Curated annotation (Swiss-Prot):
Keyword Nucleus applies: yes
Gene Ontology terms: cellular component: mitochondrion; nucleus
Keywords assigned: Cytoplasm, DNA-binding, Metal-binding, Mitochondrion, Nucleus, Repressor, Transcription, Transcription regulation, Zinc
Gene name of the encoded protein: OAF3
Name this polypeptide is given: Oleate activated transcription factor 3
Species for this entry: Zygosaccharomyces rouxii (strain ATCC 2623 / CBS 732 / NBRC 1130 / NCYC 568 / NRRL Y-229)
Stated family: Belongs to the OAF3 family.
Pfam family, one: Zn_clus
Chain residues forming the annotated DNA-binding region: 22-50
Amino acid sequence: MVLSQDVRGASVRRRNRPTVVCTNCKRRKSKCDRQNPCSNCVRFGNKDTCHYVQNPKNTESQHGEDTDNKVKKQQPQMIKGKRNGTSSSIVGSKASSISPTGQSLDVPLVLSGKNYVNLSPSGNFVEFKRSAVTMFSYFCKRAIQDRDLYLKALVTFRSIAVEMTTNTLRGTKNYSKNPSLPESFKPLSIFDADGDPLSSDSLFRQHQLIHKSLFDKYGKYRKDEAIKIVDVCELLNDNLPSRSLFIDHILVHFESHVIHMVPIFEMEFLKYDVNNFYDKWEQSREISVKDFDHMVCCVILLITKICILSTKFARLPSELLEHFEKLDTSKYIAIIHYYMFEMKSLRKCTLRQLQILLLLRFYHWCAPEDGDGDSLQHSHILMGTIIASCQEMGISWLCIRDPGIYWFQLFGQSKRVPFILSPEDFKIIYQMIWSYVLHWDRKMFLINGQECLIGKSHLYDVTGQELSWHHRMVALDHIIMKMNDILNDSPSRVDIVALKQEWNNALRIFELIRDTKKEHLHLNFEYETTLELFRLCLSHAELTHLEQVNDVESFHLTVQSLWDQIVKLASKCHRYFYGPQEMDPYSRFFTNKIISVVADKLCTLIPAFVLRLNRFGEMGFDQMNMMVKFLFGVCSMYYNELGFDYYRCFESMFTAKISYKILNRPRNKNPWEIILEFLLCQLEKEGIKDQLRELKIIQNLPVLVSLRESLNLIPEYHRDAVKLWNTDVVPIGHSSVNFTLNLREESLEPFLVDRYSQTFNIFTSFYDHASSQLAEEAEDTSSKIQYNVENSAEQAQEIAETNAVPVEHPLSLEPTNPVNLEESNLELIRNMFEPLDFISFF
């Protein structure tokens, strides 16, 4: 018995059979059983890209500690100076992921050091505000800025400088308060406060009136949406479209130009419900919740609002516009919110209720109001409600893969329309709705990097049986889901090679299955642009990672690729606004949104190139100036075309203008040097007050602490903060002396011409005219530092400046007396901006 126990406890020698791992599907095969392509890739249609690499797990078993040492050497250098003061490796020890087939697989530790990218080098960014707690998705603007040291420094400099200036000038103006606007908007009303209508400066007065009208409009948006509904019937008495207007005009427009963007209705059934609703409304002027009239009413209101957007942004004459002008539709969304979210409707769900939620999701995306918010995440909770409602009703992958398994039992009022809607019709509606919900879930992943809420995907061939454009796109879903898993399963170690490969597969298949019908051109345009936007954000994440791991060759390839993508997308926006229009103009309200998302990303990423340009020895002031002018052209295009109508576009213009003025420096003023020295100077000032732990700069840029300590060891006459940054903080900075970035100057030319020089340019107008006029009051204040407005005006630069005059006595950025740090930094700001540049933002 003892012998048997010893034998049982002894290690059994097993045959060593090395395995290989398919890089597509991660299927692991033994050497004698290997088949190329593997069965998974044959099923998924990825035969051409199937190849194997040896599983590092086998190498470990064969070589023991030697392999461990080699793997450790391959791991990227640890990134120090996180917000929590600790250091963490980019590559984790071991992880497990779930493949699309549901198998649990061991992910190889590392294929090579540069294959893995850390999307959250500072950790996941969670913002706590009174109104909301938000964890930002990996590709939203806030996360991009948080990941990039240069953009983080720019944002930190901007916020500190704005705060200093507003504190100095606070009390110089009686702010007019609009309670409907958020806190960040209130001081913007400084432009509304004063001004003589008969002033000789008519241009300034024009700016004031335009700014005020925009503030009032956006304030009304928020006020109308938040209004408390007491009597719906009274609100709708004269403002509900008549039966003839809705059925003969609005619904016809919806079927002709909008329905393919929201293919979730069986139109004959909808018309039946609408006619029943109007029969009751015209007779009693009441809306019965018990009979679900309020659901049909919400559909009518949403379709009307969407058709208003369609006709408004088409910029074409339409008789519908005349009818819409007679209706007060401002309270429609508040009424819908009242019926959907204040009456416990979310405890159960009907088909009509689900369609309302989907229409509301579509409206929030397209509407010029707040909509999806600054980070495009405000509808994420609504999307979760939609998906939960789908699951409750049986709308899932099953209705597409095996629709024959469903049978429908109709009760009550549902039995009254069997001649209109049969069980087979219900199956078709289910399939269209699920395809549409899938599309939205995957689209927001591509735009924002946020994790898909629907965690399953299946290979699905719809050839010859497409019910809608969205149903056709389900063929792409399994690839998009692979991309989601690679990105979100382990954000700190994303396999960039595998992700790019799946992106290429998605683009290739999309080109094969895209519908060429004219009514679907705008849907193809949006999806193609969404894929390009995903690649843009991924390339920027790779760029910041390569800087940290000091991979010079890959960095040079990536930085050129990223710039080419920026230029390509900017040119696409330019053609969209100024080129020939091939798409249905009534779909422009829909495509405007993806273009605004792209333009906003461009306005965020171009400054990152301007700040890095000092590292490229072959690039000088002329190239930097061209980049700044390119930034000005993109901003002018974006804000003039969309800023008058879209709330979030208008709001982002203030920070974009400040960033532009920071970067638009004369030849002898390097903007990166100014930012770096300013932040170091602020750090020194706060260090004297012993408030390091509470300082924003320490939280955002902890690397500056070690940089300051290194600078203190260098004699003053050898002090060069930029050079030390390029060698210590970003060591790759001194390895690009001979690198030349191809700016694609021929593609930049359309942006170097100010198309709005003869008209009103809203991007130019902010600060440049208003601030110089409003600054007159600042002369009479008792602030700690008095501003000389005339000198500031003389030193202020023209927009898109080309030949700046060097300053004879440049300001010393490193003060000798710590007591004067506050005054010195304010003087620095005065030399860069007009006195009230900043007060308009906070």
